[in-house]
């Protein structure tokens, strides 16, 4: 472990690179909260998705913002100390005081990842049997299961408790000294994210294939089209979120290995700019807005198309009957 001088610690926390990064995430938080409230209102009022999917999407947006608020709290706590404390000893955090906040931050992040699993399961279930698995209670059950799974996963990652005697300049990571950056907690996130992305892509391929089978019942055809469009929308939204999570975790893992032999304490401020939670908190609800608009347009287009095709097919059918009867 490297010994970091008090002068270097003060430089890291009082750096304008660090302070401007906190100002940036504070501003982005205001935007993300406003967009999220509007997105949740749209999900409630427009009824674009079925009740079970809607409930899971709202849970997803809520926990993305809770995680973002947890991260912003930790960074602002560090910013506060950088302004009002004058010594490195006062600016530094004890592992014991950081641990509950760090675990809370990790838990809320894990919830958003496991919630993507729940959404994938939901869309597969709805595609198989839309009437049985579209109820709000099914979405509520999946949300509860994702919370339980997240609790177990987080407990397994942090059951050893705080690292006694360790002091860091931020409560965000257990060790923010680049040389001591631990990646064993990052690998499981990458595995979960990549698995979810693969499942989402397979779901898109599956629903695209089911789209090719046709029926002559307008209501059945409409229900099937609705399920296909909704499944693709939710899968793409999940992929966007998971890619954002994967980007930071992948970047952090690679960065830790590249700088292991020649670390620089100022690198921790650079890493902070690449944390994608604030960006995710804006992009996810914005994507919901875009997909609601897209689904509504597709719904109207498919209804017109199916009605037109159905009338044409019925016309041909009756014309053939007329020819047969007149023979």
From Swiss-Prot:
It comes from the Eukaryota. GO terms for molecular function: G protein-coupled receptor activity; olfactory receptor activity. GO terms for biological process: detection of chemical stimulus involved in sensory perception. Its main location: membrane. It is a multi-pass membrane protein. InterPro entries: 7TM_GPCR_serpentine_rcpt_Sra, Nematode_rcpt-like_serp_alpha. Belongs to the nematode receptor-like protein sra family. This is Serpentine receptor class alpha-33.
